[in-house]
Each structure stands twice: as C-alpha cells, then as structure tokens.
C-alpha cells in the first residue's frame, strides 16, 4: 500500500487559502538549508506494537488510527472494516459490519473517538455520522443538516462535530461545518475558492483537522496555511511560502500537475513542536520540525535506521502521542520506489533488534508511537 496516496475518492477539496497579514510566513527555500535532526534527536524511543489478527480479518490498508486510554480503533479500506485492538496489539472486536441495515456502515471515510462521552464516531458517505459505544454497540446516527457525503472530522471538547467538507466540483458553499449532537449547524466557514474540475480528486490520507489540548487546527488540502479554528473563525497560525505552490488552475487537473508541486501532506502539533511532512515535487517527502522553545525550524531525518529508508511520519495523533503504521509487506515504500528483498530483510532485522521478532511480508501492520523529548 502506498503510504500517502493509497485511495483516491472522486472528490476535490476547495477551501480558501488566502494569506493573512497577521501571519509570519516561513520561506520554504530557507527551510531546505536548515540543520538536520534525527529521529533520536526529536523523540523518545519509538514504541512498536505489532497487531495480532486472525485469518478472517484483513487490515493491510489502514486509513485511520484512533488511540484511547485502553484501545486502538482502526479504519481499513479494501475491504472496509473498523477494528478495536488492545494497547498490546491483540484484537478485541470488530465494530459493526459492512451492510445496509441500521447500525451497519457502507463507505466509512473517517473515525473519531470522544473521551468525554466514551463514544466512537464514524462518518459514512451513505449513512451520515454514526455513533457507537466503546465496545461497538450501535447507538444512533446524527441527522445532519448538510448534504455533503464525504467528510473528515473531529469532536470538540464541547461535543460539537467539526467537519471538513470534501468538495465535488469546486462550487460548494461551505468549507467547515460545525454541528451539534442533534445535527443542527452551529457554525460554518464559507468556501471562497471556486473552480471547474477537469479531474476531481481528494487526498484521503491528508487529515486536514487535528486536535491537541482542546485546540482544533485546520490545514485545507493543497493549502500552505495552518489555521486555528474556533466557533466559525479561522485564525492563521503557520504559513509556508512554497516556490512551487498549488494554484487554482492546478486544481482543475491535479493529476497532471501534482508531480511538480509542493504542499503540506501531514502535520501535527504538541506542546514542544510543530511537525510537518511536505510533498516536495517528484513524489518526494520532506520532514520538518518547528521547535517552540526557540522558533527554529529544522529538517527531520526520521528514518528508523540508517540501514533502510523507512521513515516515521506523524499520520495521526492522540494528545502528545504521534502515531504511524509500518506495513511489513511494503516497509512503507511508495509505489514510485523499488522494494527489494534486501531492504525488507534489513527492516525485519532492525525490528528484531528492538524486540519485534518473526516479522515477514505476511505479518500484520505494526503501530508506531512517538512522543517528543
């Protein structure tokens, strides 16, 4: 599975990416000259947690991982499935099944766990926003006033549902919609960027919304700005001046232009750092760390080992824990790179050296947890 561009829905994200005079931008050309920090410089030792499933379950294509105090909830695609694992990696249960009956999902696009009410939320293209208890019991479906089908979302500390609307043709009214538990619209951020799609697209592995310490951060796909969101307001927080940024014309036929562009692919923030994974032309990815103590940005060499090229990337987050997944079959090499048996064996030897024995191409994915030093 390609780590970043695994599954494309026929949709496009269109949110205004205008710069604000309130924000100091970082010039990406300067970042390329920044000093380099290793994985060990930035994080405590990585925790590796091999998942343990049975032959009847396929979890090789992971779209989302939610971590709670006692579990991992994992959303997979091809086939669709939602699984609950203990923190030691053992399978506890499945969450519902794919189907048309009440309480079953058809095409889930995101999951989120609310610690406040101990509820797992599942957004589904066909069903809306479904709610399950922590043990997987179906509770209800939120009757949304919006008509948008494909969503990414977070649950605020107050219990509201903050959706990132993934647009279809570049002419939708809203960018973010904030809903009550009853499905009423509390706030929304209008979409100010309109275009005609030649080839509608979306990057489902780009998670536009993050939440840390009660703050909701928002980075529209293909946008160079990260915002803080609150009650219908977007406040620019970080911006990056990319020499090869994405334009409105690029969005009309994104597949034809992506290989020559630069944009934020993944981001996360904790009390110490801002973490960035930048799509940097020709299908390359570069990692950066903004240290809050001194405001210095460094490049990140986040390879697990010098012996092979698999990197840690902050794909998901639970408070101060940053989460990634290692797929033993691909060792997270993208489809533009050759995966040799030698590289796989070096990866498996490294895992053995950190206490993860017996990994093969057929092994289940391995959760990787990192926390800043």
Q: Which sequence ranges carry the predicted segments?
A:
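Short beta-strand elements that form the blades of beta-propeller/WD-repeat-like
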Residues: 71-76, 118-124, 158-170, 210-227, ...
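Blade/loop signatures of beta-propeller domains
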Residues: 20-52
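Asp-box/WD-like beta-propeller blade repeats and closely related beta-sheet repeat scaffolds
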Residues: 123-173, 188-196
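Short coil/turn segments at the loop-to-beta-strand junctions that recur within blades
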Residues: 53-55, 96-104, 143-150, 192-197, ...
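Blade-loop segments of beta-propeller domains
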Residues: 52-56, 61, 90-117, 124
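Repeated scaffold domains used in trafficking and secretory/extracellular systems
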Residues: 61-64, 106-111, 147-156, 198-207, ...
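Conserved blade-ending motifs and adjacent loop-strand segments that build the rim/top face
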Residues: 237-259, 293-318, 332
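Beta-strand-rich domains and repeat architectures in extracellular enzymes and scaffolds
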Residues: 47-80
């Amino acid at each position: 599975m390609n780590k970043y561009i695994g599954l494309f829905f026929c949709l496009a994200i269109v949110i205004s990416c205008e710069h604000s005079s309130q924000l100091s931008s970082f010039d990406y050309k300067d970042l390329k000259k920044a000093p380099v920090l290793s994985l060990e410089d930035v994080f405590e030792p990585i925790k590796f947690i091999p998942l343990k499933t049975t032959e009847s379950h396929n979890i090789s294509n992971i779209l989302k991982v939610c971590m709670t105090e006692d579990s991992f909830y994992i959303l997979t695609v091809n086939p669709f499935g939602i699984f609950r694992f203990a923190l030691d990696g053992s399978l506890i249960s499945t969450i519902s099944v794919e189907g048309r009956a009440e309480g079953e999902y058809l095409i889930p696009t995101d999951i989120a766990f609310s610690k406040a009410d101990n509820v797992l939320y599942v957004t589904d293209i066909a069903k809306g926003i479904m709610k399950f208890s922590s043990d997987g019991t179906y509770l209800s479906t939120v009757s949304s006033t919006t008509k948008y089908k494909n969503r990414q979302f977070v649950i605020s500390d107050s219990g509201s549902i903050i959706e990132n609307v993934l647009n279809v043709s570049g002419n939708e009214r809203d960018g973010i919609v904030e809903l009550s538990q009853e499905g009423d619209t509390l706030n929304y951020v209008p979409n100010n960027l309109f275009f005609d799609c030649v080839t509608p697209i979306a990057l489902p592995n780009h998670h536009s919304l993050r939440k840390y310490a009660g703050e909701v951060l928002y980075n529209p796909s293909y946008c160079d700005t990260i915002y803080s969101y609150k009650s219908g307001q977007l406040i620019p927080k970080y911006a990056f001046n990319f020499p090869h940024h994405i334009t409105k014309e690029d969005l009309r036929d994104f597949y034809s232009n992506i290989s020559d562009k630069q944009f934020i692919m993944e981001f996360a923030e904790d009390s110490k750092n801002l973490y960035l994974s930048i799509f940097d032309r020709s299908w390359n990815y570069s990692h950066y760390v903004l240290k809050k103590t001194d405001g210095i940005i460094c490049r990140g060499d986040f390879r697990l080992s010098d012996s092979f090229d698999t990197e840690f990337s902050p794909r998901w987050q639970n408070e101060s824990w940053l989460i990634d997944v290692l797929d033993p079959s691909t060792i997270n090499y993208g489809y533009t790179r050759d995966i040799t048996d030698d590289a796989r064996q070096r990866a498996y030897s490294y895992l053995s050296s950190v206490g993860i024995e017996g990994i093969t191409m057929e092994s289940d994915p391995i959760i990787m947890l990192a926390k800043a030093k």
